[in-house]
């Protein structure tokens, strides 16, 4: 019986902590959600432009090296 309790205790503690976390969490309000969405969109755009310019720079360099 002691082994069963010893085996089940980590799962029980994890479930208890998870339930406490979910109860404590709150949904973001509209203003906070918009701020997060805008920050994410700006980050995606910046990363896209960086990738585009890196590709734009490396295409001519690659053509010079390969000689096509």
Swiss-Prot record:
One Gene Ontology term from the biological process aspect of the record: SRP-dependent cotranslational protein targeting to membrane, translocation
Keywords: Endoplasmic reticulum, Membrane, Protein transport, Translocation, Transmembrane, Transmembrane helix, Transport
UniProt-listed Gene3D superfamilies: Preprotein translocase SecE subunit
Stored PROSITE patterns: SECE_SEC61G
InterPro entries found in the cross-reference section: Prot_translocase_SecE_dom_sf, Translocase_Sec61-g, Translocase_SecE/Sec61-g
Residues in the Cytoplasmic compartment per record: 1-32
One CC-aspect GO term: Ssh1 translocon complex
Entry membrane topology: Single-pass membrane protein
Subcellular location: Endoplasmic reticulum membrane
Transmembrane segments: 33-61
UniProt xrefs under SUPFAM superfamilies: Preprotein translocase SecE subunit
GO MF, one annotated term: protein transmembrane transporter activity
Membrane side Extracellular: residue ranges: 62-68
Pfam families membership: SecE
Membrane is among the record's keywords: yes
Family: Belongs to the SecE/SEC61-gamma family.
Assembly notes: Heterotrimeric complex composed of SEC61-alpha, SEC61-beta and SEC61-gamma.
UniProt cross-references to NCBIfam families, sorted A to Z: secE_euk_arch
Role played: Necessary for protein translocation in the endoplasmic reticulum.
Protein name: Protein transport protein Sec61 gamma-2 subunit
Source species of the chain: Drosophila melanogaster (Fruit fly)
């Amino acid at each position: 019986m002691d082994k069963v309790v010893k085996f089940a205790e980590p799962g029980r503690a994890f479930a208890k902590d998870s339930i406490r976390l979910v109860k404590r969490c709150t949904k973001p309000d509209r203003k906070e959600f918009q701020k997060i969405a805008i920050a994410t969109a700006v980050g995606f755009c910046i990363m896209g432009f960086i990738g585009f310019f890196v590709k734009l720079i490396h295409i001519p360099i690659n053509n010079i090296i390969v000689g096509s």
